[in-house]
């Protein structure tokens, strides 16, 4: 089944790879295998923009040797695998091939040598779209563990190549925690950014100006954390979270991050005003992870019955909910709809996201809680 890939290329591997040898050639004879190659990342039958950097990938197992052929008509790239690093497709060759393949399909053939003999897997295809890609992907860069938690930053990766630069590094802010960054409609001239610890708070960047939105709004609203911009850019929905971290002595999930309380509120950017409504701000529930629909008329969020924390952390099961929003009157509807019931299913929802066209909604499902990154399930 085809799936569209416009914005995802693993930047993690970019610094490890170098271009493959131009001397590689397809095997003269190979036995056909009636299965697709098991590759990582899974780039089988995807759609790509014409400016994307080379889709470098590898076989999931360690092959004796491997070769990939990528072609469109008479144009072709042949690349030999560079050991565990995989197929390191040359940027120049790749760019020439994509330029000649806009609106067409690339055929990808993967060959693997086993016990001295070559075999060829079933070919797959990459559709080259004429649509352009946003030039940068912005993300938090941090080591995949907790030992170097005080070394992190917000970085940007140029998707047309492998250039990575820092937007802000925490060595400039006292090695505190930097997270929860967001842009309105991919506008690089505006961004919100949250920091914990020293200089903690939420900061609004607008056309070169920096405003600290909150040191502490009130005793009930200690901070603004997880954001979602309204499509108009006039509002930001925030969750306000009292977050704690603990370590397990004997559990497959080594780290537990949990909210002791959380609510959702609305920030009016133009009027510098915070607004709350009982439907999103209740002592009886933990509300978090707000996300506006693409038309701005619905706010999605996660909600769970409040529990005694940390004793009952495994009882916290977040449901996926929605509520109507009228940007003209700055009002929410009276009814909250439950789209996925975490309590009934025994699962927990986090990170809801709506596609730009409004047709799809994705979310993460885990066993409990809302910090699923540390959960092996």
Which residues does each predicted region cover?
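C-terminal motif of bacterial Sec signal peptides marking the signal peptidase cleavage site
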Residues: 18-19
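Multi-bladed beta-propeller domains
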Residues: 32-42, 76-93, 160-176, 205-223, ...
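Low-complexity, Pro/Ser/Thr- and charge-rich linker/hinge segments at domain boundaries
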Residues: 39, 118-146, 219-220
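Short, conserved, GDST-rich strand-edge loop motifs in beta-rich repeat architectures
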Residues: 135-148, 238-260, 301-318, 364-377
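Conserved, compact domain cores that house catalytic/ligand-binding motifs in diverse enzymes
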Residues: 136-214, 219-220
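Hydrophobic beta-strand positions that form the internal "hydrophobic ladder"
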Residues: 137, 190-191, 233-236, 296-299, ...
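Conserved beta-strand position repeated across blades of beta-propeller domains
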Residues: 182-184, 228, 291, 353
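Residue-level detector of Asp-centered blade-edge/turn motifs that repeat once per structural unit
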Residues: 185-187, 231-232, 294-295, 356-357
């Amino acid at each position: 089944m085809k799936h569209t890939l416009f914005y995802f290329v693993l930047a993690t591997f970019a610094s490890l790879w170098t271009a493959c040898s131009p001397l590689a050639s397809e095997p003269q004879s190979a036995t056909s295998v009636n299965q697709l190659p098991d590759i990582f990342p899974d780039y089988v039958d995807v759609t790509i923009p014409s400016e994307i950097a080379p889709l470098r990938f590898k076989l999931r197992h360690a092959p004796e040797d491997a070769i990939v052929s990528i072609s469109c008509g008479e144009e072709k790239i042949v690349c030999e695998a560079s050991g565990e690093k995989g197929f390191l497709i040359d940027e120049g060759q790749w760019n020439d091939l994509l330029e000649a393949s806009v609106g067409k399909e690339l055929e990808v053939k993967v060959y693997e040598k086993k016990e001295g003999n070559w075999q060829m897997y079933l070919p797959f295809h990459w559709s080259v779209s004429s649509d352009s890609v946003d030039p940068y992907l912005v993300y938090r860069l941090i080591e995949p563990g907790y030992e170097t938690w005080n070394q992190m930053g917000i970085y940007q990766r140029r998707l047309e190549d492998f250039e990575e630069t820092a937007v802000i590094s925490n060595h400039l802010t006292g090695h505190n925690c930097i997270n929860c960054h967001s842009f309105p409609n991919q506008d690089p001239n505006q961004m919100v950014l949250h920091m914990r610890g020293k200089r903690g708070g939420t900061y609004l960047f607008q056309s070169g100006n920096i405003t600290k939105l909150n040191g502490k709004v009130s005793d009930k609203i200690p901070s603004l954390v997880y954001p979602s911009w309204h499509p108009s850019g006039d509002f930001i929905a925030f969750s306000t979270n009292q977050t704690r971290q603990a370590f397990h002595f004997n559990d497959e999930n080594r780290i537990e991050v949990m909210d002791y309380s959380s609510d959702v509120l609305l920030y009016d950017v133009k009027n510098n005003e915070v607004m709350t409504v009982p439907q999103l701000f209740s002592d009886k529930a933990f509300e978090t992870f707000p996300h506006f629909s693409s038309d701005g008329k619905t706010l999605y969020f996660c909600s769970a019955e409040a529990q005694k924390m940390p004793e009952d952390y495994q009882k916290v099961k977040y449901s996926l909910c929605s509520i109507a929003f009228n940007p003209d009157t700055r009002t929410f509807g009276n009814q909250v709809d439950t789209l996925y019931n975490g309590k009934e299913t025994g699962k927990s929802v986090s990170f809801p996201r709506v596609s730009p066209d409004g047709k799809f909604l994705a979310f993460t499902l885990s066993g409990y809680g809302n910090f699923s990154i540390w959960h092996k399930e």
